[in-house]
């Protein structure tokens, strides 16, 4: 589920994915590699990474770039990842049947991923 519900200025585009079915610790391992990089470099890195977390993050980067291009008219070549964060979500609780009518709890972690893209030229003018 991808949501965006922020008041944005003309220089940044955001995308948020909630309840991604993986641990926040494992997703942070991928997010730390792309923070601060350009959009094209991020796409190349994520497509070659062997981790399971890279696919939902890649989809989210594409979504944030589409928001920047279509809604704000920014150029794809000037975008960079200004903010990328992973927060822990709720645990999906399930029961695993065991012998003699018993059951064990399974807690499956989820996480929320936020990507913010900024324009290099416009962010330099504002500072």
From Swiss-Prot:
Predominant location: plastid
UniProt keyword RNA-binding present: yes
Matches recorded under PROSITE patterns: RIBOSOMAL_L22
GO molecular function per UniProt: rRNA binding; structural constituent of ribosome
Subcellular location, record wording: Plastid, Chloroplast
One GO cellular component term noted in the UniProt record for this chain: large ribosomal subunit
One GO biological process term: translation
Keyword terms of this UniProt record: Chloroplast, Plastid, Ribonucleoprotein, Ribosomal protein, RNA-binding, rRNA-binding
Pfam families associated with the record: Ribosomal_L22
Entries under InterPro entries matching the protein: Ribosomal_uL22, Ribosomal_uL22_bac/chlpt-type, Ribosomal_uL22_bac/org-type, Ribosomal_uL22_CS, Ribosomal_uL22_sf
NCBIfam families xrefs: rplV_bact
Similarity remark: Belongs to the universal ribosomal protein uL22 family.
Oligomeric form and interacting partners: Part of the 50S ribosomal subunit.
Known function: This protein binds specifically to 23S rRNA. The globular domain of the protein is located near the polypeptide exit tunnel on the outside of the subunit, while an extended beta-hairpin is found that lines the wall of the exit tunnel in the center of the 70S ribosome.
Name used for this protein in its record: Large ribosomal subunit protein uL22c
Lineage: Eukaryota, Viridiplantae, Streptophyta, Embryophyta, Tracheophyta
Gene name of this polypeptide: rpl22
């Amino acid at each position: 589920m991808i949501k965006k519900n922020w008041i944005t200025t003309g220089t940044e585009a955001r995308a948020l994915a909630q309840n991604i079915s993986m641990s926040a610790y494992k997703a942070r391992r991928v997010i730390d590699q792309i923070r601060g990089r350009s959009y094209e470099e991020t796409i190349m890195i994520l497509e070659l990474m062997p981790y399971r977390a890279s696919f939902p993050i890649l989809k989210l980067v594409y979504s944030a770039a589409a928001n920047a291009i279509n809604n704000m008219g920014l150029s794809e070549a000037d975008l960079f990842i200004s903010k990328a964060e992973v927060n822990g979500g709720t645990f999906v609780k399930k029961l695993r049947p065991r012998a003699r009518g018993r059951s064990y709890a399974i807690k499956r972690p989820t996480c929320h991923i936020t990507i913010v893209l900024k324009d290099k030229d416009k962010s330099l003018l504002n500072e």
